[in-house]
């Protein structure tokens, strides 16, 4: 299924319904930085949303809620992931700003340069809205 067709709301809701409290969501990314090589692991601490047509909230009808995403990922879970990766001797990037694009196409060179100039380190197609939807349902997410 292409990333822009994933029903993120249904997936996150289902996880909440079965009692999940914490989500570790690995994803494939492209690097926008030369020091982030294939095989390295980047633990995002920020994201930039460049998607267009995704259902990105549970609060689009009735109740209105404004959820803070200033720090979108759980610091404790991030630290656990960083520690585990270091124990396994992986090349870990402890901070990364990840830009999420709509897909299914990859970015152009011009877009990648723009994202790099914005401070993005990695690029993918599935981080958003998953991380925000999880936060709306009080699920811990990285």
Language-model regions, residue ranges each:
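Non-catalytic positions within long, well-ordered alpha-helices that form the structural scaffold/packing
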Residues: 16-17, 116, 135
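Active-site rim beta-loop-alpha module in soluble metabolic enzymes
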Residues: 72-114
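A structural signal for small-residue-enriched, beta-sheet-centric alpha/beta enzyme cores
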Residues: 127-136
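General beta-strand structural signal in soluble alpha/beta enzymes
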Residues: 23-27, 43, 92-95, 99, ...
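Active-site glycine- and acidic-residue-rich loops that bind
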Residues: 71, 105-106, 118-126
